Amino acid sequence: MQSVIAYLKQQEIKPLLRFITCGSVDDGKSTLIGHLLYDSQCLAEDQLADLTVDSQRYGTQGEHIDYALLLDGLAAEREQGITIDVAYRYFDTEKRKFIVADCPGHAQYTRNMATGASSADAAVVLVDARKGLLTQTRRHSYIVALLGIRHVVLAVNKMDLVGYDQQTFEAIASDYLALAAKLGINQVQCIPLSALEGDNLCKRSARMLWYVGPSLLEYLEALEPADVDLAAAMCLPVQWVNRPDSQFRGFTGTLAAGRVRSGDGVVVLPSGCVSRVVRVFNGDTEVHEAVAGQAVTLTLADEIDISRGDVIAATDDPPEVADQVTAYVLWMDDTALLPGRRYWLKLGARMVAASVSDIKHRVDVNTQEQRVAQRLQLNELGYCQLSLDAPVAFVPYARNRVLGSFILIDRQSNATVGAGTLDSGVHCASNVHWQPLDIDHVARARIKGQTPKVLWFTGLSGAGKSAIANIVDKRLHALGYHTFILDGDNVRHGLNRDLSFTVEDRVENIRRVAEVARLMVDAGLVVLVSFISPFRDERQLARERFAADEFVEVFVDVPLAVAEARDVKGLYAKARAGLITDFTGIDSPYEPPQHPELHLRADQGTPEQLASQVLSLLGVEGK
């Protein structure tokens, strides 16, 4: 029993190193990790037995063990002989514990590689000695640099296939050191090895006596990862407001930087309220001091409104607070990122609505060149400006990974669609404030004797939106209502004449119209908006500009065949002939509303009958 306790204590104090392996397809990443696991005797007997069987069934090494099969766990990976998902493995030696991520080499899985790199202390970049640096080598090295991994190993693999030639290794090492210098990677260890044969993997190889450096495992065991900067100003992202009873109110989270003691002055962000730390807890134990990386609970001297997602920070050098930020964004979804489209941005425990207001440039991660872009496709990286609905506290990623990284979440599916690293805040509008007005929208509506709202008519071209809206407008006007129609065609003659019909410009088209409609509702009007508005995200954006009872979505539904048969403007014929591109229903999608306030079947009634349904919904039909 004592030996077990001693072993567990030894495991507790062993330092942990997280590292990734990356590089081009078939450079031997999975083989390298598998051989490390095998040589470090971290495999159970049943795993060894399974490996022998799998090597015969799936292996690529003839009668020999195929170490890569320890990592390639998906059936698709084994059948294709490639890595698709990020495979995490744990192993340890007498000196250290390791968590290693085997990242896929194919370009289409760059998002997976970035996921693995986000928490790594070091990166092992593999290069095939026969091929030298390839496009994916440069791509992965750029992402390694972008994500702030400071320790990089260049593992020139398959040296057995070039006769363990020194000149081949030195030429590749020279090329990579030049690339690393360009990317700002300063700490690079170049190691020649053979993952298959085990040369320079766990111990020095007799086949390469010309190499005087450490083996890969020796280097990783001795590596000192970047220590948490305890000299940095204290930052605590609040994950939980801890109130076990009415006598105790603490704020719990993991310290992202610095150290904290009782008596320290703090500021709460983004509110800016100032207080003082009274007590510090690590778990249930009150402590004098806590440092970065520890989970803590703080109590403060003052009753301050603090919620999950707020940041408690030292007063001398607090994080920046902004609602406009610049960041590198790696797009991870099949549907492109579009400026103006709204997402959830999750930074630590804080969640705010956000949109990309501008893509400054797209980065060609193969060449590091900056290119003009109007959207970001899957696996593309862009330098963007983001607009947030509320200010957030952050630290640039180069200084703090926790408070400098975020993810973007699709508001409809809740899928993670992007990841980013924050660069700086944009304060171009920090001196712009709301001007208080004595006459508000309630007073304007009262004098008109009506309840202002927006009727948002959406549907395919030719569905009858404009005709129905026009009839509703005439009937409301006859009843003494103050109304205005914003029609899609008419607005494009003035306000939106600079916009095309690309997906990007359609997003901006709806954003502008929603803002104009909001101003008109504030003026006390009943606004009828007649736009195709094909995308749910943009209609949701419009809805969020209004109070819950001010927005009425009217879906004018008609089969595409019926709308195309009408074709009053001849647009469908032109789209079919290829004279018009990005035409809704033909080569651009229409996303029907899921829960409209009113669903009109436009092929089952006249415009007058359908208009009556709208008026009935408003409670004015028959007046």
UniProtKB/Swiss-Prot annotation:
PROSITE patterns with a match to the protein in the record: G_TR_1 (PS00301), G_TR_2 (PS51722)
Domain of life: Bacteria
Region (G5): 194-196
GO biological process: hydrogen sulfide biosynthetic process; sulfate assimilation
Region (G4): 157-160
This protein's UniProt keywords: ATP-binding, GTP-binding, Kinase, Multifunctional enzyme, Nucleotide-binding, Nucleotidyltransferase, Transferase
Region entry Sulfate adenylyltransferase, spans: 1-450
EC number from the UniProt entry: 2.7.7.4, 2.7.1.25
Sequence positions that bind GTP: 23-30, 102-106, 157-160
Active-site residues, record numbering mapped to chain: S533 (phosphoserine intermediate)
Family: In the C-terminal section; belongs to the APS kinase family. In the N-terminal section; belongs to the TRAFAC class translation factor GTPase superfamily. Classic translation factor GTPase family. CysN/NodQ subfamily.
Subunit structure: Heterodimer composed of CysD, the smaller subunit, and CysNC.
Name under which the protein is recorded: Bifunctional enzyme CysN/CysC
Primary gene name: cysNC
